[in-house]
């Protein structure tokens, strides 16, 4: 049985854990990040466009969204759009393939925005691609930073999962973002096992994370066909 080291936050890993188990592999939980809510305030009551960066942004930004009005709502990808749909909120548009800030900016429905007030729901920090892109068209951009990603403290669970994982000659490591990978590196360094982990294939969700992983010294990297949990499970076969 092949082991799969799952680095998602514990609150978000259950579905992927079940898929890995059902595919005949052994999931090992190694959460690298905790998602913590931030108190955010917005300046306006109405925005021409509202954008959600991630499913976490939806989860933690929903209360603010209920208190404002907006003309259009966009997401960076299908998973975030689905999260809004789960709350019966209709999304106007999102990139259907290769979800990214660049792909969102390239949409006809988004590139036409000019002289508009735009609110972006996101986590603390992150890339400035959207802000820069929108400001080129004289839009006013505001952030609602509604959550933070904090690297987990090393626990007995981490050590136990890692010991089981490294005892096998075959295995995969699944990471879902650059920040997720940063957390893995920090925790692996604390255990003294980073070089050992780099001997195993790393499963990532995008070419951007692949490039970042390469700069971090990972060489065996598999990019999933899309960002779904099913896509992660499919590359294990």
Predicted regions and their residues:
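Signature of uroporphyrinogen-III synthase
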Residues: 1-237
């Amino acid at each position: 049985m092949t082991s799969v080291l799952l680095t998602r936050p514990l609150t978000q890993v259950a579905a992927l854990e079940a898929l890995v188990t059902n595919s005949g592999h052994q999931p090992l939980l190694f959460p690298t990040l905790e998602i913590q809510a931030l108190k955010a305030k917005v300046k306006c009551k109405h925005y021409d466009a509202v954008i959600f960066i991630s499913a976490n942004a939806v989860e933690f930004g929903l209360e603010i969204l209920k208190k404002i009005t907006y003309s259009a709502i966009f997401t960076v990808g299908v998973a975030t759009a689905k999260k809004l749909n789960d709350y019966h909120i209709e999304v106007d548009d999102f990139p259907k393939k290769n979800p990214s800030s660049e792909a969102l900016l390239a949409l006809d429905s988004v590139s036409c925005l000019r002289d508009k007030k735009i609110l972006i729901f996101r986590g603390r920090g992150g890339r400035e691609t959207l802000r820069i892109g929108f400001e080129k068209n004289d839009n006013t951009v505001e952030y609602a930073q509604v959550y933070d990603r904090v690297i987990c403290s090393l626990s007995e669970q981490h050590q136990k999962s890692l010991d089981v994982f490294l005892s096998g000659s075959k295995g995969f490591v699944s990471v879902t973002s650059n920040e997720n990978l940063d957390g893995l590196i920090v925790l692996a360094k604390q255990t003294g096992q980073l070089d050992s982990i780099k001997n195993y294939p790393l499963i990532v969700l995008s070419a951007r994370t692949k490039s970042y992983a390469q700069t971090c010294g990972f060489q065996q990297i598999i990019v999933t066909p899309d960002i779904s949990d099913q896509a992660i499970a499919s590359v294990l076969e």
